[in-house]
């Protein structure tokens, strides 16, 4: 058997973090078994579904590296096929037309509430003769669900879960306007797409009982269900925007690497021993449904940020530079020339050790490519007082024709200057840092001098020395 999984979002908004994890679990399971991962857009809500949301879902999945194996299926386009399945059930006596009016259904529910019963359809038209159909009333089609016994789901995560059949009413398959319901559409699409494993949030667990009964009625094999626990905030409350319930594009904009987010998401509910950091290839190799826990996972932005920092330190400098340049160009409003790319690449080793996100990296790296004269922040201004500018003037004199231009020799020069002045090295280094970076925080300043080279270094020193 070829394993086939699917991710089936509704295009009514962004690809939120819970949906991204569901997609990831489906993708990992399919890849682990050498199977297929399919994408279905459940766009039956024509009012709320938008092309922009569809594009955002595609973009989010692509950014996360979750590739799908066939052209996406759009559920609304298959409405005729869904209706066909419902009419087949009517022809077989396994579904029926219900002519209850909205007022009758309301009265039915109120009567049940008055008796302390859960409100649900009472099967009024289940066994009535079609000849009794009232004129001018468009019917719905309902499934003739089993009334006795139990329906049991053997869930790969939740275990065996059972419901008494008398707790489920005859659900609607086709509305009175002929449009299919979610329950019908999902079952028909999963069957026609050859889905073998349905991996989704455990908020769908109650749906699985009704869908199982529909599979039975249609004579189709039921897929394996795996209902995964939802994600909560770090405080244990339902995940919300304040916890980080944002779209995938928001995490990209906040400077997270897709591989770091994949690593973090797969650990929300799934474990492989004590391993915390692992490659996507390892996750594919190790992933199993049996290793998914039943308890809700807690999303912790601080842990994600720390993990992202770990990934950044291990990421190739060329790739980080390629990711950084467009971000800096957008932030600074300039085109960075090839020479600027080279500066960023040369300084990357010292920069990435101090940043946990690409946003932080951009803030740290901006001084390399800012136009002269550099803007000096308020704290750095204090290092460029009269004494600081005097130090810079002396340094400029010593740097003319200085050789070799290496971080070690430059540091030795600064040490000699500090000894001559009877001050600590930091007293000399701070005005240099302020002049070259516009800040009091940077990579090692003599490394910065080496990377900037003599011309740019001297130009910035002179700018700051004459700064008032």
Swiss-Prot record:
Gene: gltX2
Residues binding ATP, per UniProt: 241
Its biological purpose: Catalyzes the attachment of glutamate to tRNA(Glu) in a two-step reaction: glutamate is first activated by ATP to form Glu-AMP and then transferred to the acceptor end of tRNA(Glu).
EC annotation from Swiss-Prot or TrEMBL: 6.1.1.17
Protein name: Glutamate--tRNA ligase 2
A Gene Ontology molecular function term of the record: tRNA binding
Family according to the record: Belongs to the class-I aminoacyl-tRNA synthetase family. Glutamate--tRNA ligase type 1 subfamily.
Subunit structure as annotated in this protein's UniProt entry: Monomer.
Reaction(s) the record says it catalyses: tRNA(Glu) + L-glutamate + ATP = L-glutamyl-tRNA(Glu) + AMP + diphosphate
Alphabetical list of InterPro entries matching this protein: aa-tRNA-synth_I_cd-bd, aa-tRNA-synth_I_codon-bd_sub2, aa-tRNA-synth_I_CS, aa_tRNA-synth_I_cd-bd_sf, Glu-tRNA-ligase_bac/mito, Glu/Gln-tRNA-synth, Glu/Gln-tRNA-synth_Ib_cat-dom, GluQ/Sye
PROSITE patterns: AA_TRNA_LIGASE_I
Motif ('HIGH' region): 9-19
GO biological process: one example: glutamyl-tRNA aminoacylation
Compartments in which it is found: Cytoplasm
Enzyme class per UniProt: ligase
Organism: Rhodospirillum rubrum (strain ATCC 11170 / ATH 1.1.1 / DSM 467 / LMG 4362 / NCIMB 8255 / S1)
PANTHER family per record: GLUTAMATE--TRNA LIGASE, GLUTAMATE--TRNA LIGASE, MITOCHONDRIAL-RELATED
GO CC entries: cytosol
Keywords assigned by UniProt, alphabetized: Aminoacyl-tRNA synthetase, ATP-binding, Cytoplasm, Ligase, Nucleotide-binding, Protein biosynthesis
Intervals of motif 'KMSKS' region: 238-242
Primary location class: cytoplasm
